[in-house]
Amino acid sequence: MRCDRVWINARLATLAPGRQGLGIVEDGVVACLGGRIAYAGPAAAAPTFEAAESIDVDGRWITPGLIDPHTHLVFAGDRAHEFELRLAGASYEEIARAGGGIVSTMRATRAASEAELIAAALPRLDALLAEGVTTVEIKSGYGLSLDDELKSLRAARALADIRRVGVTTTFLGAHALPPEYRDDEDGYVDLVCQTMIPAIAARGLADAVDGFCEGIGFSPAQIRRVFDAAKAHGLPVKLHAEQLSNLSGAALAAEYNALSADHLEHLDAAGIAAMAASGTVATLLPGAYYFTRETLVPPIAALRAAGVPMALATDCNPGTSPLTSPLLVMNMAATLFRMTVEECLAGVTREAARALGLLADRGTLEAGKACDLAIWDVERPAELVYRMGFNPLHARVWRGL
């Protein structure tokens, strides 16, 4: 078999559906041709390769490249001072009334140029890449005007031209109410549905549409309007749901066959059943749970029992999860949410790909999929979940390079 390069003497965690557990292959080989996996499996069953390059990984573990399916990487400014205020006892509402919160980030993002947003996002992206991330989802949602949302999405797309990484973009105009619409919520939803979504779809700048369904965000009726507009323009949807309260957002998302419903601390049985029926992925965000000192854990056992796929993400954002470590996310999911090692590793690979609608293309080590790999200096895959403040990444491979 002709191939561009082959990795030999490897241990594989393929995460392939149908294989038991992590899909472990103790003496494995991965071969790449044209940026796609040509073979991933036991050396004993491998064809004879005619490879331009052969790489001996000396018994290291190879997993699919990690995928971060929920981030807000593109923003300007920071909210460290608000963190200090919260530690001193100020409530989120008090900080918001004083001009902080999402509106603070909105002001900084609006004031920044596209080039400045790219420059600010690069260190955050680089931190993800340093831990094996090969695909990242990036949301808008800090511009909250047509021009600034377009600017944010262009900046997110530009990151894929600067770094070797896959980027998917999500329009999150229904994130918060900008000050100029303080007394006209439905007027802002009109803007999102009638102006922003058509303009963004026409430019091909978004791969999906998201919303924040909460008492401090947007109502289910308003989110339904956003979803209808998204569907009218051929865009799949996803939703921040049940983070702070239960507004049945997950069930609403499932009604629209959403790719994912995210957060889910307050998810109920009806929402779980709806997600299971629609195949909507539960994207869990333990960093936000930790940082906001939430006490209600997402219903992991019920999600597991219902067969709802569970993805994990950093939720990197300046207000509630200033986190750029998928390895720490896995540890948090195991320790705080009681997820298994297998669930954690699947959550940042296979199920993360599923949450982005990309499972046919990446997220597992299978022939035909993108040759996105993470090669690790560990003795067993559980170390990736078990250890904290530890980065054993040996090499990151994107599209075979």
Curated annotation (Swiss-Prot):
> Which amino acids does the record list as binding Fe(3+)?
70, 72, 240, 315
Top-level lineage group: Bacteria
What Gene Ontology terms describe where this protein resides (cellular component)? cytoplasm
| Subcellular location per the Swiss-Prot or TrEMBL entry | Cytoplasm
Recorded hits in Pfam families, A to Z, give: Amidohydro_1 (PF01979)
**Where does this protein hold 4-imidazolone-5-propanoate?**
79, 142, 175, 243, 320
User: What's one GO BP annotation on this UniProt entry?
Assistant: L-histidine catabolic process to glutamate and formamide
Q: Which residues bind Zn(2+)?
A: 70, 72, 240, 315
Q: Name one GO molecular function term.
A: zinc ion binding
Which keywords does the record carry? Cytoplasm, Histidine metabolism, Hydrolase, Iron, Metal-binding, Zinc
Q: In which pathway does it act?
A: Amino-acid degradation; L-histidine degradation into L-glutamate; N-formimidoyl-L-glutamate from L-histidine: step 3/3
Give the main location: cytoplasm
Q: Which coenzymes or cofactors are required?
A: Zn(2+); Fe(3+)
Reported EC number(s) for this entry are 3.5.2.7
Q: Where does N-formimidoyl-L-glutamate bind?
A: 142, 317, 319
Question: In the record's cofactor note, how is the cofactor described as bound?
Answer: Binds 1 zinc or iron ion per subunit.
Q: Spell out the HAMAP family in the cross-references.
A: HutI (MF_00372)
Q: Which PANTHER family match?
A: IMIDAZOLONEPROPIONASE, IMIDAZOLONEPROPIONASE-RELATED
| Its job | Catalyzes the hydrolytic cleavage of the carbon-nitrogen bond in imidazolone-5-propanoate to yield N-formimidoyl-L-glutamate. It is the third step in the universal histidine degradation pathway.
Q: Return the protein name.
A: Imidazolonepropionase
